[in-house]
């Protein structure tokens, strides 16, 4: 893992775990009219783009244990709640590695990857289109109907729900890959929230064979 990225990741983790001790300082700075961006510049903190790249480096590193990878994933998810950061996934080259993590051997990693995908594409047509281009929707459908981990399945449905709403190309792609018993041969209106909710509710209740 790149040394600079490692330092940034440590900075991010320390700031997320020590947030309570820094509240007074942050409040003082805010009361003086300093924005978070100005504070980052003044105190030399890394940019959101730096933190996003550092998190992904950690997620792909063999030197980072699962516990710290989940911390990095949590930080990553919070960062991409901002639509500007979500739209930076593409120029930063982070979409492809994020989608690849949907197939990770660790259930918690798959769960967090799906969660991040769902957060990034919510009410974001640019990101919704990226899922279609990357052919990630069939993976999410398979994950929502066959992943042995219930929490991972739940987040996969969340990602699908965010991906298809009000974006017809994603809805059409998902419809092609739904299992038998779903409305695969008919047009589903991505703007029809009742229709979308019906499919998502059915996916949440989809029976999964026990791996035992």
From Swiss-Prot:
Membrane-spanning segments: none
**InterPro entries linked to this entry:** ARM-like (IPR011989), ARM-type_fold (IPR016024), Hsp70_NEF-Inhibitors (IPR050693), Nucleotide_exch_fac_Fes1 (IPR013918)
Any one Gene Ontology BP term: cytoplasm protein quality control by the ubiquitin-proteasome system
Q: Where are the ARM repeats?
A: 23-64, 83-122, 125-165
Its subcellular locations are: Cytoplasm
Q: List UniProt keywords, sorted A-Z.
A: Cytoplasm, Repeat, Translation regulation
Mention one GO molecular function. adenyl-nucleotide exchange factor activity
Gene3D superfamilies reported in the protein's UniProt record:
Leucine-rich Repeat Variant
A Pfam family (short name) is Fes1
**GO terms for cellular component:** cytosol; endoplasmic reticulum
Q: Which family does it belong to?
A: Belongs to the FES1 family.
Write out the function statement from the record. Answer: Functions as a nucleotide exchange factor (NEF) for Hsp70 chaperones which accelerates the release of ADP. Required for fully efficient Hsp70-mediated folding of proteins.
Name of this chain's protein? Hsp70 nucleotide exchange factor fes1
């Amino acid at each position: 893992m790149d040394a600079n990225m490692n330092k940034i990741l440590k900075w991010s983790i320390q700031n997320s775990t020590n947030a309570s001790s820094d509240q007074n300082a942050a409040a003082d700075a805010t009361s003086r009219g300093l924005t978070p961006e100005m504070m980052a510049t003044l105190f030399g903190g890394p940019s959101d783009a730096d933190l996003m790249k550092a998190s992904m480096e950690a997620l792909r590193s063999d030197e980072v244990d699962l516990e710290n990878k989940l911390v990095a994933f949590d930080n990553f998810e919070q960062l991409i709640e901002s639509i500007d950061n979500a739209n930076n996934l593409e120029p930063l080259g982070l979409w492809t590695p994020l989608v690849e993590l949907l197939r990770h051997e660790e259930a918690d990693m798959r769960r967090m990857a799906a969660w991040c995908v769902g957060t990034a594409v919510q009410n974001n047509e640019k990101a919704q289109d990226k899922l279609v281009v990357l052919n990630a929707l069939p993976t999410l459908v398979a994950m929502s109907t066959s992943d042995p981990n219930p929490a991972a399945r739940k987040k996969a449905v969340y990602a699908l729900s965010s991906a298809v709403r009000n974006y017809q190309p994603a809805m059409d792609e998902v419809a092609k890959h739904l299992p038998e018993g779903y409305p695969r041969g008919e047009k589903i209106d991505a703007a029809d929230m009742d229709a979308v909710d019906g499919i998502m509710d059915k996916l949440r209740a989809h029976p999964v064979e026990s791996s035992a």
